[in-house]
C-alpha cells in the first residue's frame, strides 16, 4: 500500500505502516548475510553482532555495543535481510527464530506500530500511551479490506471475521489472551466498538427500543462498564485488571446487522472479595460506592465514606491515581439504566455489596474455658442482617451454632473463632460470586432480542498462561484452559497449512501438532488424572492435602513424563508437584486445594438466605442444595449427587462447552504482550517479552511453521524479482510460462534443491532459503550496478573530451577571422565601403516593409483561424476524455460485479458438488454399514455375552492383583520414605546410620520374603485353567474379527483400485487443466499486453495534452512577441520617416557641401544594418509561427483520430477477452471441483483406514501396561543442601549490603559535616567582607566631611575675595582723587605690591599644588572604591557559590533520603528473610517429628505385613505344606520385627537427644533473632535521629542563606548609594576647580591692588597650612584603614589555607574509611571461606550417606554395631562438651576484647565519638557473626577429627579477628591524634582572632586620637581665623 493509499488512515498512518521512504532506506542499509547474526546475551536474551572469526565449532563475534563474545556455533542465529525490517507478518521472515521475532516486535514497537501478524496470530504490544489508531477514520479505512490489503490491526482481525461470517456463512471467534496489564480488555472493547459501528441495526432498533433503555449497540457497549465495576480490580501490574474471563457472543442477522448478544464468564477471582495484597485493592464497586458521589447510597447502606472502616476492602491500597471512582460510579449506574435494570434490582445489588462490607467487620471472641465462639458486639451483624433482609439473632446463631445432619437427625455444632471467621469469608465470597453470575444472566436477558439471528462472532477475553513463584489451584485451572486453547490453535493452524499444501499439490506427511499437548491434557482431565483424583479426595471425609499428594505420586510419579517432583528452592514457597506444560514447567503448591474445590458453606446461614425478605438474595440461593439436603422419596439420591458439584468439575464442564463452541467456529487469534513491568512507554524488556511469547504460543506457532514451508511466493512475482540471478534461463524474446521459468531459474542456481517445492500457483521455500536468494540477488545487483557506473563514467568522459575538441576548433576559426579583419580594417577602400554600403539599401527597405505588412496581415488572419480551430479541437478532446473515463468506470464496475458474481457462482457450484458428493458417499457408506451391521450384530451379541462373563472373572482377578500390587507399592514407598528419613538421621550421628543399615537389610529381607510369597502366590495360576478355556473362546472370536478385517482389507484393496483409476482420471484432468491454464495465461498475457498498450496510449494522450498546453503557452508568447514586433515596427516606421527627412536634409547639405558626407555615410550604414537585422528577425518569427501552427493542427487531428480508433479497438478486444476469461474460469472451476471431490473421497478412505488401525493399536496398548518407578532421593537431598548453601549466601550478601548501607550513611554524614564547616567558613568570609565594606563606608563619610570643610573654606576665600574686590574699588576711587598727590607713594606702594603679588603668585601656586594633591587623593579614593566594588562582586560570587552549594547539598540530601529509603526496604527484606529462616528452622523441627512418625508408621507397616501374611495363609489353607512354610516365615518375621523394634527404640532415644539439641539451637536462634531485631530497631532510631539532624541543618542552612541574600542585597544598595555620592562629589570637585580658575584670573587682574589684602592673604596661607595638616591626618587615617584591610585580607587567606588543610584531612579520613571498608571485605571473604568449609562438610556428609547406602548388604551386623555406636556416641558427647568449653573460652576472649574497646571508647570520647560508635557497631556485628559461625559449626561437626580441624580454623579466625581489632585500635589512636591536631588548629585560630581583635582595638584607639587632634586643629584654625579677622579690622580702622 503506497503512501497515497495510506492517506485514508489519516493521523494513524505513521503508527500502522512504514512510509515508502523508510522502506527504501531499509533496503539500502549495508548488510552481510554471512556475518550479521544474533548471539545470546544474559541481560537482553539476544543481541545483534558481526562475526569476526570461526574456529573449532566456536564463533567469535562483536556485538553492537563493541563487546566481543565467543559462543558455540549452534547458538548463533542469522539476521534477516533489511527488506524484512519491521515486517508486518513475521511468518514471512526468511530466518524464523526467537531473536528475529523479538527484534521485529521491538523495532516495530519503537516506531509505535503495536500490531504485528505472526502467521495466524495478531500480536499486540501495550503502548502505555494513547495512540490515534482507533478513531472513526481508521474504522472506515479498515471496513471491507482484506487482511493483506491493510496494515495489522485489531480492526482488521474484526473486519475479516465479519466478512468471513457473511461470505462463508460460518460462525467466527476471536481469542484474545495475555498477561494482566497486556491490553486484553482494551482490545475486547475495540472489537465490540468496531462491530457496533459497522453492523448497527439502524432505525428499526431505535423504534423498537423500550423507553429508558438504550439501543442494542448502546447496551452491548454499556455491558462492559457494569461488568468491570464488579469484576475488575487494581493489581500490581494493572490498574484495571479483569479478574474473570469472558466469552462475548455477538449475534447477527442474515444481512449482517446486529441481532443480539450474550456473555459467558469464567473463573471469577472471588478470594479478592475478602483478601488483597498490599499493592492491590478490592473490586472497583466498593470504592465507587464510598466515593460519596451519591450520598443517598451511603445512607441506604449504613456506611461511611472511609474505606479503612471496613476490613475486607482496606487490606491493600484504596485509591488509584488513574481512576476517578466518583465518575465511574455514575458510569456504572447509568450502565444499569441503559441495560434496563429496575430500581429495585439496582438497590438490591448495592445492598448486598454493602452487606459484604459489614460482614468483614463482624467480630467474635472465645468463650472462657470453652472452644466456643460468641459475638463480640452485634452492631455490624445488625446492619448486615438488615441489608440482607435477615434476622440478626438468627444470623449470629447460625454462624456460632450451625445445625449439622447426623444420620436422620440434626445436631447443633459448636464453632470456634477461626471456624466462624472462615465461614463468614466463604459466605461473603459466595454471595458476591452468585450476585456477579446473576448480573451476567440479567444482562444476557436484556441483550436477548426477539430479532432473527443467523450467525455469531464470539470474543474470548481470558487470562494467559501463568507461571508465578507460588502457583495454586487457580493457576492450574487457567493453565489447563490455555493448554486446551493452544492445542486447539495448533490443530487449527496445521489443518490450514495442510489445506494450503493440498490445494497447491505439495507432497506432505500429515503431522497433528495438537497431539503434542495431549499427554499433559490427559494427565489433568482423564480418569485418575489430577482433577479426577482431586474430586475423589473431596468425597472422603478424612482426606487431606497430603493424602491427595500421596495419591498423585502413586498414580503419576515415574509413569508420566509430564508429572515431575519439584526442586524446592530456599526462600520460595514449597512446591509439591510439577507439570510440564507447553510454555514451561510449573511448580504447584497443593495447600488448601480440597477446601477450594469443595467450597463449603454454612448451610444454616444459607437456609436463612433462602428465606430472606430481600428478593435477590433468596433467588441467588434458591437452587442451592448442600451435602445434607433431604432426599425426596425415590429421587433423593440422584438429587444429592447432582447438587454436590466441585469447582474443578464445574470448570471442566464450562471449558468443554467453550471448546465445543470454538470448534464450531472459524477462530482468529490475538496475543497481547506487556512490554515492561514499570508501565514505561516505548521501553521493551526482552526477557519478559520472550517469556510471554513462549507462554502465549507464538513461538509454538513458529515451531510448527518451521516444520513446513514458511515462505511462499507467486510464480510471477518470483520470476520478476529473481530473474536477474540468471537471465539466460528465461530468454527475453520468447514467451515462457511463469512456473516453467521459475523451475528453470531455480534449477540453474547453485542451491539445495530439496529446500523448495513447486505448487500450482506458488513456489514454496524452507526457512532460510529465501534469505540466501536475497543475498545472491544483492551480489548480482552490485556487480551490474558497478558495470553500469563504469560504462556511464566512460561515456561522460568521452562526451566531455569531444566538447573540448569542438571548443578548440571554434577558437582557432574565430582567431583566424579576427586576425584577417584586423589586417584589412584600415585600408582606404574598406573605409569607403563601410561608409557607402548602408546608403545603397534604403529604397529596398521601404519595399520590404510594405511586403512585410501584407504578410503580417495574412499571418494574423491565419493565426486567428488556427486559434478557433484549436479551441474546437480542445473542446472535442475534453468531451472524448470524459467519455473515455466514463467508459472506464463502467468497465471497472462491470468487472467488479462480474468478479463478485463469479465468486458467488463458484462458491455455489463448489457447495453443490460437495453436497452431492457427500450425499452419494453417505448413501454408499450407509448401505455398506447396514450390511456390515447386520452381520456384526449377531456376532456382537454372542461376543458380548461371552465377554461379560470373561470381564467379570478378569476384573475380580485384576482387583485382587491390583490390591496386592498397590499394597506392595505402598509398602515400598513407605520403606523408601523410612530409608530417606534414616539417611537424614545418619547425617547427624554415625550410629543411626548403622542402625539404618540394619533396618534396611531387615527390610530387604522382608522384601525378599515377600517376593518369595509372591512366587508362591503364582501357584494360584492353576486356578486360571478354567479361564484359559474362556481365553480360547476369546481367541476364536478374535479369529472371527480377523476374518472381518480381511474382508475390510479386500474392500480396501478394491477401493485402492478405484482410487488408482480416479487418480489416473485426475491426472488426465490435471493435464487438461494445465493446458487450460496455459491458454488462460496466454490470454491473460495478451490482456496484460493490451492493457499496457492502453496505458501507453493514455500516457501518450496525456503527453499530447501537455504538448498542447505548451504550444498554447508558446502561441501566447509568440503573440506577445508579435505585439512587441508591432511596436518595434511602428518605432522603425517612425525612425524610417525621421531618417528619410534627415536623408533629404543630408542630400541637400551634400549638394551644398559637396564631399563632406563621411559621417552621414557611417550613420546610414548603421541604420541599414539595424533595419536588415529587424527584418530578418521578423521573417524568422513569421515562418516559425506558421510552421508550428501547421504542425500542431496536423498532430492534434491525427492524435484525436488515432485515440478514437484505439479506444474502439480496445473496447472490442476487452469484451472478447472477458468472455473468453469467464468461459475458461467456468471450465477451470468445474475441473477443480471434480479434483477436490476425488481428493476428499480419497482422504475419507484413508481416514477410515487410519481409524481402524488406531482402534487395533488401542486394543493392543490396553493389554501392554507396565510399571515404572524412579527413586530421586539423592537428587532431592542435593537440591536441599544446595538451597541451604544458597540461602546462607543470600544472608551473607544481605548482611554485607546492610554494612555497606551503614558505611554509605556514615560517609554522607561526614559530607554533611564538611559542607556545614564550609558554610561556616563562607559565613566568616562574608562577615569579614561586610566589616571591610563598613570601614570603607566610614572612610567615605570622613572624605565627605573633609569635602564639606573644603567647600566651607572655599566659600570663605570667596567672601575674602569679594571683600578684597570692594576694597580695590575703594582704593581705585581714592587713587583717582589723590593720584597727583601720591604718585611717589604709589611708586613705593607699587614696589610693595609687586613684592606682594609675587608672594600671592607663590600662594596661588601653593593652592594649585594643593588642588592637584586633592585631585590625586580623589583618584586614589576612586581606585579604593573600585577595589571595594571588586570585593563586593567577590562577595556576590561567594553568595552565588553558596547558592550553588546549597542546591548541591539539596541534591545530596535527596540522594541520601533515597538511599535511606532503599536501606529501609533492604532492612525489611532482611527481616523477612530472618522470618523465613525461622520458619525453615521450624520446618526442620517438623521434619524430625515426621521422622518419628515414620518410624511409628514403619512399626504399623510391619504389623500390617504380619496381618497380610496371616490373610495369605488363610487364603492358601487348601495346602498344608504352604501353611507350614508360611508359619516358619511368620516366626522369622516376628523375630526380625523384635530386632527392628529394639533398634528402633535405641534410635528413638538418640532422636530424643537430638531433639534436645534442636530445641537448644532453636532457643539460641530466637536469641539471635531478638538481638538482630533490637539492633535493627537501634539502627532505625539512629537513622531517624540523623534524618531529624539533617533536616535541622537544612533549615539552618536555609536561614543562613536567606540572611546572606539579604546582606548581599543591602551591600548592593549601599554600593549604589556610594556610587551616587561619588558622582556628586566629582561634580562638586569639578565645580570647585572652575571656581578656583576664575579666582586665579581675578587675582591676576588685581595684582596692582593687593597691597592692603596682604593680611588676608597671610590668613589664607595659614588656613591653607591647616588644611594641609587636615589632609595629612586624613591620609594617615586612610593608610591605617589600608593596613587594616590588608590584615583582613591576610586573615581571609589564612582561613582559606586552613580550609584547604581541612579538605586534605577529609581526604585522608576518607582513605582511612576505605581502608576500613577493605578490612570489612576481608572479614566477609573469611566468612565466605568458612561457608565454603561448611559446604565441604556437607559434601562429606553426602559421601558418608553414599557409603551408608553402599553398605546396605552388611545390615545383619546391626545389633553388634549398635553397641559400638553407643560407645561412639559417648565419645561424640564428650567431644561436644569439649567444644562447648572451647566456645565459652572464646566468648570470654570476646568479652575481654569488648572491655578493651569500651576503654578505648572512653579515651576517645571527645574527638572520635561517632567513629567509635561505628567501630563499636561493627565489632558487635563481628561478634554476632562469630557467635553464629561458632554455633553453626558446633552443630555441623561430624566426628572428632573434623571437629578438631574446625576448632583450629576457629582459633585461627579468632586470632585474625584479634589482629583486626588491634588494627582498629590503632586507627582509633590515629583519629584521637587527629582530633588533638584539630584542637590545636582551633586554638591557634582563636589566638589569631584575639590578636586581630587587639590590633583592631589599637587602630580604633589611634583613630579616636586622630579625631581628637583634628578637633583641636580645627579649633586652632577657627581661633586663627578670628584673630586674622581682628587684625584685618584693626588695620582698616588704623588706615
From Swiss-Prot:
The modification Phosphothreonine is found at residues 378, 1282, 1309, 1513. This is Myosin-7. It holds the Pfam family Myosin_tail_1. It is found in: Cytoplasm, Myofibril; Cytoplasm, Myofibril, Sarcomere. Residues 840-1935 form a coiled coil. The modification Phosphoserine is found at residues 1137, 1269, 1510. Residues 1915-1935 are annotated as: Disordered. The modification N6,N6,N6-trimethyllysine is found at residue 129. Myosins are actin-based motor molecules with ATPase activity essential for muscle contraction. Forms regular bipolar thick filaments that, together with actin thin filaments, constitute the fundamental contractile unit of skeletal and cardiac muscle. Residues 655-677, 757-771 are annotated as: Actin-binding. Keywords: Actin-binding, ATP-binding, Calmodulin-binding, Coiled coil, Cytoplasm, Methylation, Motor protein, Muscle protein, Myosin, Nucleotide-binding, Phosphoprotein, Thick filament. The cardiac alpha isoform is a 'fast' ATPase myosin, while the beta isoform is a 'slow' ATPase. Muscle myosin is a hexameric protein that consists of 2 heavy chain subunits (MHC), 2 alkali light chain subunits (MLC) and 2 regulatory light chain subunits (MLC-2). Interacts with ECPAS. Interacts (via C-terminus) with LRRC39. InterPro entries: Kinesin_motor_dom_sf, Myosin_head_motor_dom-like, Myosin_N, Myosin_S1_N, Myosin_tail, P-loop_NTPase, XRCC4-like_C. Residues 781-810 form the IQ domain. PANTHER family: MYOSIN HEAVY CHAIN, NON-MUSCLE, MYOSIN-7. Expressed in type 1 myofibers in the soleus muscle (at protein level). The keyword Cell division does not apply. The modification Phosphotyrosine is found at residue 1308. ATP binds at residues 178-185. Residues 1923-1935 have a biased composition (Basic and acidic residues). GO terms for cellular component: cytoplasm; myofibril; myosin complex; myosin filament; sarcomere; stress fiber; Z disc. Residues 32-81 form the Myosin N-terminal SH3-like domain. One of its GO terms (molecular function) is microfilament motor activity. It comes from Mus musculus.
Amino acid at each position: 500500500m503506497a503512501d497515497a493509499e495510506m492517506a485514508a488512515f489519516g493521523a494513524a498512518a505513521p503508527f500502522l505502516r512504514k512510509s515508502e521512504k523508510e522502506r527504501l532506506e531499509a533496503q539500502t542499509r549495508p548488510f552481510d548475510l554471512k556475518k550479521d547474526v544474533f548471539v545470546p546475551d544474559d541481560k537482553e536474551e539476544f543481541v545483534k553482532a558481526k562475526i569476526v572469526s570461526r574456529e573449532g565449532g566456536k564463533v567469535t563475534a562483536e556485538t553492537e555495543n563493541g563487546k566481543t563474545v565467543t559462543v558455540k556455533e549452534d547458538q548463533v542465529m542469522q539476521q534477516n535481510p533489511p527488506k524484512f525490517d519491521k515486517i508486518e507478518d513475521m511468518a514471512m521472515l526468511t530466518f524464523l527464530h526467537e531473536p528475529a521475532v523479538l527484534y521485529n516486535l521491538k523495532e516495530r514497537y519503537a516506531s509505535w506500530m503495536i500490531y504485528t501478524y505472526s502467521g495466524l496470530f495478531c500480536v499486540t504490544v501495550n503502548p502505555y500511551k494513547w495512540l490515534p489508531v482507533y478513531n472513526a477514520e481508521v474504522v472506515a479505512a479498515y471496513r471491507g479490506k482484506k487482511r493483506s490489503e491493510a496494515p495489522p490491526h485489531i480492526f482488521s482481525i474484526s473486519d475479516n471475521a465479519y466478512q468471513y461470517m457473511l461470505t462463508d456463512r460460518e460462525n467466527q471467534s476471536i481469542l484474545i489472551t495475555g498477561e494482566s496489564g497486556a491490553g486484553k480488555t482494551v482490545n475486547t472493547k475495540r472489537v465490540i466498538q468496531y462491530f457496533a459501528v459497522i453492523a448497527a441495526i439502524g432505525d428499526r432498533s431505535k423504534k423498537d427500543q423500550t423507553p429508558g433503555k438504550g439501543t442494542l449497540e448502546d447496551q452491548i457497549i454499556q455491558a462492559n462498564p457494569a461488568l468491570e465495576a464488579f469484576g475488575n480490580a487494581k493489581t500490581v501490574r494493572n490498574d484495571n485488571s479483569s479478574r474473570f474471563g469472558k466469552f462475548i457472543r455477538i449475534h447477527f442477522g442474515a444481512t449482517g446487522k446486529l441481532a443480539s448478544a450474550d456473555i459467558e464468564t469464567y473463573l471469577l477471582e472471588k478470594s479478592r472479595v475478602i483478601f488483597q495484597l498490599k499493592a492491590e485493592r478490592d473490586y472497583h464497586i466498593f470504592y465507587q460506592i464510598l466515593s460519596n458521589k451519591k450520598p443517598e447510597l451511603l445512607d441506604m447502606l449504613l456506611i461511611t465514606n472511609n474505606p479503612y472502616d471496613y476490613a475486607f476492602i482496606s487490606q491493600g491500597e484504596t485509591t488509584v491515581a488513574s481512576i476517578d471512582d466518583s465518575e465511574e460510579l455514575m458510569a456504572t449506574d447509568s450502565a444499569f439504566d441503559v441495560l434496563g435494570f429496575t430500581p429495585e434490582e439496582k438497590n438490591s445489588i448495592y445492598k448486598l455489596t454493602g452487606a459484604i462490607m459489614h460482614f468483614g467487620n463482624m467480630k467474635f471472641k472465645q468463650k472462657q474455658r470453652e472452644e466456643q465462639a460468641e459475638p463480640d458486639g452485634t452492631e455490624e451483624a445488625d446492619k448486615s442482617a438488615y441489608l440482607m433482609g435477615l434476622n440478626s439473632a438468627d444470623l449470629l446463631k447460625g454462624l456460632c451454632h450451625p445445625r449439622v445432619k447426623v444420620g436422620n437427625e440434626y445436631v447443633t455444632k459448636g464453632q470456634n473463632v477461626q471456624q466462624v471467621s472462615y465461614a463468614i469469608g466463604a459466605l461473603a465470597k459466595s454471595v458476591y460470586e452468585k450476585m456477579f453470575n446473576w448480573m451476567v444472566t440479567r444482562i444476557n436477558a436484556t441483550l436477548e432480542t426477539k430479532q432473527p439471528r443467523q450467525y455469531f462472532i464470539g470474543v474470548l477475553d481470558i487470562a494467559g498462561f501463568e507461571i508465578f513463584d507460588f502457583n495454586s489451584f487457580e493457576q492450574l485451572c487457567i493453565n489447563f484452559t490455555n493448554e486446551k486453547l493452544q492445542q486447539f490453535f495448533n490443530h487449527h493452524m496445521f489443518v490450514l497449512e495442510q489445506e494450503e499444501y493440498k490445494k497447491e499439490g505439495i507432497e506432505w506427511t500429515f503431522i497433528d501438532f495438537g497431539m503434542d499437548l495431549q499427554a499433559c491434557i490427559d494427565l489433568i482431565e482423564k480418569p485418575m488424572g489430577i482433577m479426577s483424583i482431586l474430586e475423589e479426595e473431596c468425597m472422603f471425609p478424612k482426606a487431606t492435602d497430603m493424602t491427595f499428594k500421596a495419591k498423585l505420586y502413586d498414580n503419576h510419579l515415574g509413569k508420566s513424563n509430564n508429572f515431575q517432583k519439584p526442586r524446592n528452592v530456599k526462600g520460595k514457597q514449597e512446591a509439591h508437584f510439577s507439570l510440564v506444560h507447553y510454555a514451561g514447567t510449573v511448580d504447584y503448591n497443593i495447600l488448601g486445594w480440597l477446601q477450594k474445590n469443595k467450597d463449603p458453606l454454612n448451610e444454616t446461614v444459607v437456609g436463612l438466605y433462602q428465606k430472606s425478605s430481600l428478593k435477590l438474595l433468596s433467588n441467588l440461593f434458591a437452587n442451592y442444595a448442600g451435602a445434607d439436603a433431604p432426599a425426596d422419596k425415590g429421587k433423593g439420591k440422584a438429587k444429592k449427587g447432582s447438587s454436590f458439584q466441585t469447582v474443578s468439575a464445574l470448570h471442566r464442564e464450562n471449558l468443554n462447552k467453550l471448546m465445543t463452541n470454538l470448534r464450531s467456529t472459524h477462530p482468529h487469534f490475538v496475543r497481547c504482550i506487556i512490554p515492561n513491568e514499570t508501565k514505561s512507554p516505548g521501553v521493551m524488556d526482552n526477557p519478559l517479552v520472550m517469556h510471554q511469547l513462549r507462554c502465549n504460543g507464538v513461538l509454538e506457532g513458529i515451531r510448527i511453521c518451521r516444520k513446513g514451508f514458511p515462505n511462499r511466493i507467486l510464480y510471477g512475482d518470483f520470476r520478476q524479482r529473481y530473474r536477474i540471478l540468471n537471465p539466460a534461463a528465461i530468454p527475453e524474446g520468447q514467451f515462457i510460462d511463469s512456473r516453467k521459468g521459475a523451475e528453470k531459474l531455480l534449477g540453474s542456481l547453485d542451491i539445495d534443491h530439496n529446500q523448495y517445492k513447486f505448487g500450482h500457483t506458488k513456489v514454496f521455500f524452507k526457512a532460510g532459503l529465501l534469505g540466501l536468494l536475497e543475498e545472491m540477488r544483492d551480489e548480482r545487483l552490485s556487480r551490474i550496478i558497478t558495470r553500469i557506473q563504469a560504462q556511464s563514467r566512460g561515456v561522460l568522459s568521452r562526451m566531455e573530451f569531444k566538447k573540448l575538441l569542438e571548443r578548440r576548433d571554434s577558437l582557432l576559426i574565430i582567431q583566424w577571422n579576427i586576425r584577417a579583419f584586423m589586417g584589412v580594417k584600415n585600408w582606404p577602400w574598406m573605409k569607403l565601403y563601410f561608409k557607402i554600403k548602408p546608403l545603397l539599401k534604403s529604397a529596398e527597405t521601404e519595399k520590404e516593409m510594405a511586403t512585410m505588412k501584407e504578410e503580417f496581415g495574412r499571418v494574423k488572419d491565419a493565426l486567428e483561424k488556427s486559434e478557433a480551430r484549436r479551441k474546437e479541437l480542445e473542446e472535442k478532446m475534453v468531451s472524448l476524455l470524459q467519455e473515455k473515463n466514463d467508459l472506464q468506470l463502467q468497465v471497472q464496475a462491470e468487472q467488479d460485479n462480474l468478479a463478485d458474481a463469479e465468486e458467488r457462482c463458484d462458491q455455489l457450484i463448489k457447495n453443490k458438488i460437495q453436497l452431492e458428493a457427500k450425499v452419494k458417499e453417505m448413501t454408499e457408506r450407509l448401505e455398506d454399514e447396514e450390511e456390515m451391521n447386520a452381520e456384526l450384530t449377531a456376532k456382537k451379541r454372542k461376543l458380548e455375552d461371552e465377554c461379560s462373563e470373561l470381564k467379570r472373572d478378569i476384573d475380580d482377578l485384576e482387583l485382587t492383583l491390583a490390591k496386592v500390587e498397590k499394597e506392595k507399592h505402598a509398602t515400598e514407598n513407605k520403606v523408601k520414605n523410612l530409608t530417606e528419613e534414616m539417611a537424614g538421621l545418619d547425617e547427624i550421628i554415625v550410629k543411626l546410620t548403622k542402625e539404618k543399615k540394619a533396618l534396611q537389610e531387615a527390610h530387604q529381607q522382608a522384601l525378599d520374603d515377600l517376593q518369595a510369597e509372591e512366587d508362591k502366590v503364582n501357584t494360584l495360576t492353576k486356578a486360571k485353567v478354567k479361564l484359559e478355556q474362556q481365553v480360547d473362546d476369546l481367541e476364536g472370536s478374535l479369529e472371527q474379527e480377523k476374518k472381518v478385517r480381511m474382508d475390510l482389507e479386500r474392500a480396501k484393496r478394491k477401493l485402492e483400485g478405484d482410487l488408482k483409476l480416479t487418480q489416473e482420471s485426475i491426472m488426465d484432468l490435471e493435464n487438461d487443466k494445465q493446458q487450460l491454464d496455459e491458454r488462460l495465461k496466454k490470454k491473460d498475457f495478451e490482456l496484460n499486453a493490451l492493457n499496457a498498450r492502453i496505458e501507453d496510449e493514455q500516457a501518450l494522450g496525456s503527453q499530447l495534452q501537455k504538448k498542447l498546453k505548451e504550444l498554447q503557452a508558446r502561441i501566447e508568447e509568440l503573440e506577445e512577441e508579435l505585439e512587441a514586433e508591432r511596436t518595434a515596427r511602428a518605432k522603425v516606421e517612425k525612425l524610417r520617416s525621421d531618417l528619410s527627412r534627415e536623408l533629404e536634409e543630408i542630400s541637400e547639405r551634400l549638394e551644398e557641401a559637396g564631399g563632406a558626407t563621411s559621417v552621414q555615410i557611417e550613420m546610414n550604414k548603421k541604420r541599414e544594418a539595424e533595419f536588415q537585422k529587424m527584418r530578418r528577425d521578423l521573417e524568422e518569427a513569421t515562418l516559425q509561427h506558421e510552421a508550428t501552427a501547421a504542425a500542431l493542427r496536423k498532430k492534434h487531428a491525427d492524435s484525436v483520430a488515432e485515440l478514437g480508433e484505439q479506444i474502439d479497438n480496445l473496447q472490442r478486444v476487452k469484451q472478447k477477452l472477458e468472455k473468453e476469461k469467464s468461459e475458461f474460469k467456468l471450465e477451470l472451476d468445474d475441473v477443480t471441483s471434480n479434483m477436490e471431490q476425488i481428493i476428499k473421497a480419497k482422504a475419507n478412505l484413508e481416514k477410515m483406514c487410519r481409524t481402524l488401525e488406531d482402534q487395533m493399536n488401542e486394543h493392543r496398548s490396553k493389554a501392554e501396561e507396565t510399571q515404572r518407578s524412579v527413586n530421586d532421593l539423592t537428587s532431592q537431598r542435593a537440591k536441599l543442601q544446595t538451597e541451604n548453601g544458597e540461602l546462607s549466601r543470600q544472608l551473607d550478601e544481605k548482611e554485607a549490603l546492610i554494612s555497606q548501607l551503614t558505611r554509605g550513611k556514615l560517609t554522607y554524614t561526614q559530607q554533611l559535616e564538611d559542607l556545614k564547616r564550609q558554610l561556616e567558613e563562607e559565613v566568616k568570609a562574608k562577615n569579614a567582607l561586610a566589616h571591610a565594606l563598613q570601614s570603607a563606608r566610614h572612610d567615605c563619610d570622613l572624605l565627605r566631611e573633609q569635602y564639606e570643610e573644603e567647600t566651607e573654606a572655599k566659600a570663605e576665600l570667596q567672601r575674602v575675595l569679594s571683600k578684597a574686590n570692594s576694597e580695590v574699588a575703594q582704593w581705585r576711587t581714592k587713587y583717582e582723587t589723590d593720584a597727583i598727590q601720591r604718585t611717589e607713594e604709589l611708586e613705593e606702594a607699587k614696589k610693595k605690591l609687586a613684592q606682594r603679588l609675587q608672594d600671592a603668585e607663590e600662594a596661588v601656586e601653593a593652592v594649585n599644588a594643593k588642588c592637584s594633591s586633592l585631585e590625586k587623593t580623589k583618584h586614589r579614593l576612586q581606585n579604593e572604591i573600585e577595589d571595594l566594588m571588586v570585593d563586593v562582586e567577590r562577595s556576590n560570587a561567594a553568595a552565588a557559590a553558596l547558592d550553588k552549594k546549597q542546591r548541591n547539598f539539596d541534591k545530596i540530601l535527596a540522594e541520601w533520603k533515597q538511599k535511606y529509603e532503599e536501606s529501609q526496604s533492604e532492612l525489611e527484606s532482611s527481616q523477612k528473610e530472618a522470618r523465613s529462616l525461622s520458619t525453615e528452622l521450624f520446618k526442620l523441627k517438623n521434619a524430625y517429628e515426621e521422622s518419628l512418625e515414620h518410624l511409628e508408621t514403619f512399626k504399623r507397616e510391619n504389623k500390617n505385613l504380619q496381618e497380610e501374611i496371616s490373610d495369605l495363609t488363610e487364603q492358601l489353607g487348601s495346602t498344608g505344606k504352604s501353611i507350614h512354610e508360611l508359619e516358619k516365615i511368620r516366626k522369622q518375621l516376628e523375630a526380625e520385627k523384635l530386632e527392628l523394634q529394639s533398634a528402633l527404640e535405641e534410635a528413638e532415644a538418640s532422636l530424643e537427644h537430638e531433639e534436645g539439641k534442636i530445641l537448644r539451637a532453636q532457643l539460641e536462634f530466637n536469641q539471635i533473632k531478638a538481638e538482630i531485631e533490637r539492633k535493627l530497631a537501634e539502627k532505625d532510631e539512629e537513622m531517624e535521629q540523623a534524618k531529624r539532624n539533617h533536616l535541622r541543618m537544612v533549615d539552618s542552612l536555609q536561614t543562613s542563606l536567606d540572611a546572606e541574600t539579604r546582606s548581599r542585597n543591602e551591600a548592593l544598595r549601599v554600593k549604589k548609594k556610594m556610587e551616587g555620592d561619588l558622582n556628586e562629589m566629582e561634580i562638586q570637585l569639578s565645580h570647585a576647580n572652575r571656581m578656583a580658575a576664575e579666582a586665579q584670573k581675578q587675582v591676576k587682574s588685581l595684582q596692582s591692588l593687593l597691597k592692603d589684602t596682604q593680611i588676608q592673604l597671610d590668613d589664607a596661607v595659614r588656613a591653607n597650612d591647616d588644611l594641609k595638616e587636615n589632609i595629612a591626618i586624613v591620609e594617615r587615617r586612610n593608610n591605617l584603614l589600608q593596613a587594616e584591610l590588608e590584615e583582613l585580607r591576610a586573615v581571609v587567606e589564612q582561613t582559606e589555607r586552613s580550609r584547604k588543610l581541612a579538605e586534605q584531612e577529609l581526604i585522608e579520613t576518607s582513605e582511612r574509611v576505605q581502608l576500613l571498608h577493605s578490612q570489612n571485605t576481608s572479614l566477609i571473604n573469611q566468612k565466605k571461606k568458612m561457608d565454603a568449609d561448611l559446604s565441604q562438610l556437607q559434601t562429606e556428609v553426602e559421601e558418608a550417606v553414599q557409603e551408608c547406602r553402599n553398605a546396605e548388604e552388611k545390615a545383619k551386623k546391626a545389633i553388634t554395631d549398635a553397641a559400638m555406636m553407643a560407645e561412639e556416641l559417648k565419645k561424640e558427647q564428650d567431644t561436644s562438651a569439649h567444644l562447648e568449653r572451647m566456645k565459652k573460652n572464646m566468648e570470654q576472649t570476646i568479652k575481654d576484647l569488648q572491655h578493651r574497646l569500651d576503654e578505648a571508647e572512653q579515651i576517645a570520647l571527645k574527638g572520635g565519638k561517632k567513629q567509635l560508635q561505628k567501630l563499636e557497631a561493627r565489632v558487635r556485628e563481628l561478634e554476632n557473626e562469630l557467635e553464629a559461625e561458632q554455633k553453626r559449626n558446633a552443630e555441623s561437626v561430624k566426628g572428632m577429627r573434623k571437629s578438631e580441624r574446625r576448632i583450629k580454623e576457629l582459633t585461627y579466625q579468632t586470632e585474625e579477628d584479634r589482629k583486626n581489632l588491634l588494627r582498629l585500635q590503632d586507627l582509633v589512636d590515629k583519629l584521637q591524634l587527629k582530633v588533638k591536631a584539630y584542637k590545636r588548629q582551633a586554638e591557634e585560630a582563636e589566638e589569631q582572632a584575639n590578636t586581630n581583635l587587639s590590633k583592631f582595638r589599637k587602630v580604633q584607639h589611634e583613630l579616636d586620637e586622630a579625631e581628637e587632634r583634628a578637633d583641636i586643629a580645627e579649633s586652632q584654625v577657627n581661633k586663627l581665623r578670628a584673630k586674622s579677622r581682628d587684625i584685618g579690622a584693626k588695620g582698616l580702622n588704623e588706615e
